[in-house]
Amino acid sequence: MAGRDITEGRANQAIAVDVGIVSTSAYWQNTSDSYDVALGGQPFFYAISDARPYIRQTAPYNKDKFDNSPEPGEQSLTGWWLRSQSSFHSGSGIKFYDPSAGETVSHRFTDSKNVNVWTKGQATLLKDVATGHVTTYPVESNGRSFQQLRSIKWGSNDGVLLHDGYDVDKIDTTGVETHFIDYNAGADDKVYAICDDGTTAYWVTNDTGPSGKLEVNKKVLTADSTTSATPMFTINGVTVTNATMEYVKDRIVMAANNKIYEFPTSQATAPTALYTHSDDDIIFTSITASGPAIYIAGYSGIQSSIFKFTLNTAGVMPTLTSAITAAEMPVGEKIHKIYYYLGYMMIGTNKGIRAAVVSDQDGSINYGPLIVETTQPCYDFAARDRFVWCATSVAGEPGVIRIDLGNEIETLRFAYANDIYYTGVSGVETTSCAFLGETDRLAFCTEAINQKSVTNKERTTTTATITSAAHGFVAGDVIYVIGVDAALDGNWTITSVTTNTITFTTTTSGTIASTAVTNAFVGKPGYSYLEAASTLASTGYITTGYIRYGTLEPKNFKRLLARGDFSYGSLILETVDKDGVEYDHITYEAGVTAVEVTTSSPSTAQEYVAYKFVFNRDATTTSQGPVFKGYQAKATIATPRQRTMQFPVYCFDIETDRYNVVSGYEGKAFARLQLLEDVEENGDVVAWQDLTTGENRQVVIEEISFTRMTPPDKRFDGFGGIIEITIRTV
């Protein structure tokens, strides 16, 4: 006799649960039974009463917290997420501003121009910059710069000595130039290197006589180009193609071609090379000295090293058959400048700037990572107080970067930021920097570019035309002409061009028609630039790091407040979104109270934003501008709020729906409870259906509480009761 089929149920009641394991993502569809709610595909009847209400509320989204931030008020107990910054003295170089990351982020920002950030607790405009003397020599094909600025003082005049290829000029604090060496590009050779001991300048060139031999000259700094130089010595059989020289430790050290010489300032005969490098093609670039040693940097191809020469007990550099290699750069990184200051050696390369610690015992050096990667080589350094200025350009425009050796962010990585620069010029490299004598005013210079040979010259009255194949200039360009003709050499504005000719108008008149001499050139000039004595830059800015509050969730950035003194000039507050789009909010200036502003743009929630503060100097008192002391931003989390719902359901073997339809079987209650607890233990997301309203949500089960009660029918085993279920939407 066949037994009863399980689907027949008991007491003619159908099975109310699925056979097998129920999927947590399953949905329930009412058929003959009108269930009220389903969770993970399991249906239940509500057991709602005054004693057991259905509760629905917003899930907590702010955790309990206390204020332990280094910036007061950084934690919010009022619903706002706060971010504030009261100083910028640790420099630029971060992308995200998360102060919890420590000193590598605290008091730093992303970018700035024309802003002095080095006073703790405030930021102000830097000084303005004006153009000075033109430069007419480009960077050499081997990568060497033939511009060099040196701080000098002659008589009562503070200024700089500008070496520019064939010429050397003195420039004072007012920008007035005095020709010091005036070699003719068509008749003389260039100045390959120059140094001074504070009163006299020394330089190396080639004697243009038949032998073309190396020649070292000197001249007191109070002289000018009308004063003849004093030849110190010549070296027969040596023609200079590359050189660097420096006055260190009461002597001149000179590297010419692949040989290194040492001689006193009174030298009158050719010295003997104390070291000859095995590579004839090596390019020596820079010389400096620490307490126990003298260093010379150079590169050959894509390999670059620093060579060390230690002094013996008599204070004499020993003659070496091989130099001591103190440091080697990574392949492809070439050293252009080394500069010893405050116990560190600054290293300028084609990749950027490094610092090395120097042993005061044996002069050994240990260099660190790149402090900053630059868009051009770092050709030069200048120093005052705890700061070092670096000739690197500022975002492709003529200018310098400043490094604070008193603020070490990481091992041998120091705080840095853009410093003074000249806006509106691009495509040139900043090649040198120096202070104007004893002042705190900086000068820097740029290379000339697009230098082309001139093969012919002619002039009718004041209209001059020179021939230069495929020159690439256009009408309106300012050019320099050197070595062509005394009447045509100088700086001119082009009036017209053809593919191979350039026409301009001269200040004198006369007829000229002849082939140009050898070493005649035309090009686009560079300039020297002088920092102003008191006038501030007209505008500047600071852009903060992106603020994301340490989470990737979207936020509503809604409030911004800046603090400072805005009696002079103005400060504009802007938001910068992730795509770099800027949104103006308010301008603080005299007569406008610095109030907290609503930042309604961008209008949508953002994962992160930055803030940009634009400084404008005072229109009347140009030596004054805004003093910015910090900001505070407020945001709220934009993540959709979650809801918790708590409701009771029946869990008995036999149950009746609202239409008195009975369903169930013996053991059903315990089986359903176990299935529900299994889903809870997995922590998975399940489908919740309110079958009375049609609402469907994805939820997680927060809590299940089962209360066992007396079953309505004593025929059953007695297991059953009320389940209190708490869920949270996701």
Q: What is each residue range found by the language model?
A:
Residues 432-449, 523-538:
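Blade-level signature of beta-propeller repeat domains, shared across WD40, Kelch, NHL, RCC1
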Residues 230, 235, 277, 531-552, ...:
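Short Trp-Ser/Thr-centered turn/loop motifs at beta-strand boundaries
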Residues 398, 635-730:
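Extracellular/virion structural assembly segments
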